[in-house]
């Protein structure tokens, strides 16, 4: 069950890029945090940004995490143009807080702004990523068959609306 707590991951561009390995690394960190709370099923909702959310790097990391930690992971993609997710709301709150600041000069100031952006409720949980927090998921991505799905049909990653990984069958794709 969710706790309505927003989680933010930050790093500057001298530390890492903003590609699928970086996003997968943040998601893996989030999954590990949830395991400490006894969570066995995690459901992610995200937009259709293929470069960050809907790609074989993220999916390979989910398969790895599902098998390694014995958990179920479900990732649902929102319909383009029909929904607004919690991430959009969080970004709006952070942007609003930024407008109230005269200037921001350092990454530390950004982190403090993000932590304090939410006026009511729990503040956002902010993790400042370091180089050691990022992984390269290329090797595990290469071990998967991305050409066909479990039933042998052509796998169109851009058409995926939902994908589920079970610890007993980490390669299942819906």
For each feature predicted by the language model, list its residue ranges.
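Extended mixed-charge, aromatic/glycine-enriched low-complexity segments
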Residues: 1-174
């Amino acid at each position: 069950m969710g706790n309505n707590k927003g989680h933010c991951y930050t790093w500057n561009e001298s530390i890492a890029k903003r590609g699928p390995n970086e996003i997968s690394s943040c998601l893996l960190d989030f999954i590990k945090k949830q395991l400490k709370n006894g969570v066995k099923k995690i459901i992610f909702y995200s937009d259709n940004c293929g470069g960050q959310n809907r790609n074989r790097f993220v999916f390979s990391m989910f398969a790895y995490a599902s098998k390694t930690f014995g958990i179920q992971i479900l990732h649902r993609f929102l319909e383009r143009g029909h929904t607004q997710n919690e991430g959009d709301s969080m970004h709006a709150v952070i942007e609003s807080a930024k407008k109230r600041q005269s200037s921001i000069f350092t990454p530390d100031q950004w982190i403090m702004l993000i932590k304090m952006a939410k006026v009511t409720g729990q503040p956002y949980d902010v993790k400042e990523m370091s180089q050691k927090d990022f992984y390269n998921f290329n090797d595990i991505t290469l071990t998967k068959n991305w050409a066909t799905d479990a039933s042998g049909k052509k796998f169109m990653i851009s058409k995926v609306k939902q994908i589920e990984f079970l610890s007993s069958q980490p390669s299942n794709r819906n």
